[in-house]
Structure formats: structure tokens, C-alpha cells
Amino acid sequence: MELNTIGIAGTVAAAPQRHHNIYGQEGVYALWLDITRDSGIVDRILVLFQGNKINSESLGAYPPDAFTPDDLVELIKEGSRLEVTGQLQTYKDWDTGRSQLFVWGAYLAVLPEGSQQLNAVYIKGEILRQPVYRETPKGKHITDLAVLVPSAFTEGYTCIIPCITWGKNAEYTAYLEPGTPIYLEGRLQSREYMKGDQALTTWEVSASKADTKE
């Protein structure tokens, strides 16, 4: 059974902007959603979506047929509280040459001020290559995983979701063979790191549950 679901809720960092058409999808917009962890660290997550996926009633846009999808997008402002459900996907960023992880939004709704934050990921895929087991400078044991999931855009194609497991899950997943089916639960996080003198950001699923028997 295929599974690729993410639900997030946080604060819009800046008003949505037009994005280039992706995998044949037209009328695509992009926004960055900020979600604050209990530790105070902010994860900034890229959301791509189409205007017709917005819940118009959550924006006070009534009757719904009086507003075009573009009208609805313009009602989402910097600082808006937003809920998004959809799938995790990747695309090649030709400006940087890197793969960009993003949420492909299937449903968006504006939330009341002060609403609770959300960051929950559930995926089932298969291990692409040999996992990498490592120890962080703070002494934590982590395993890096590359997990293949189906493309949301092209039947028969896949995309690669970078994931990490930690603690006992890191030990459990460290020696899984490529092709092994795996189920992961966790959250999507952004993480800064240094490459030489350059500060870069990467995105990954931080999995709190890992199972090869689901």
C-alpha cells in the first residue's frame, strides 16, 4: 500500500508568489510556512499549490463561486495562519543544481490567530541506497536514509525523500538493504549546515517511528 501524507500548520513567512509550472501543473504558487518546534527552532517549509486547492470559506470568501483561484491566493498574506495537507515531493532546482523537497498542497485553509501548530508526516516507500549511520558532534546517533516514493505527477515515476532516524531507530535502520520497504512517521524539518564557507539549508523527514513490517 502506498502512503505519502503530510499535514502542517504554521505562519506564512511571505505572501504567495507565482512559481514556474511544475511537472505539467499550471497556475502553481509558492509560499514558505514557518513552524516553530517546542525547542524554539523554526522550520521553514516550501509549499507549492494551485489556487483551486484553497478552502474559500476559511478566507471568508463567500459565495465561493464569486472568487477565482487567483483571487483566493491574494487573500493569503504574510503572517496568516495556514493549514496545509498534501504529499512530500521533490524537484530539481536548476538555479542551485540541488534537489528541493516541498509539500504539494492538496488542501489549504486559513486558521484563526493563535491556532495550534502541526507538523506530521507519514510515508511508506523503499530504501534507495545503503543507509549511512553516523554520530553527530553532540554524540547523537543518526542514520541518513534516501526513501523512494511514487511521484504525485507522473505515473510510474518516483522521487527521493531524504529522511533521518535517531536513537534506537537509527540502529534499526542502519543496515537495511536497498529495496527494503519502510514505513516512517515523523515531521518535516529544515536544517542549516556549512559547506566550506557557505551556509546552506537542507530539508528532511525526522522520523520518530520506523518499521519495515507495516
Q: What residues fall within each predicted segment?
A:
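Single-stranded nucleic acid-binding surfaces, predominantly the OB-fold ssDNA-binding core
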Residues: 1-214
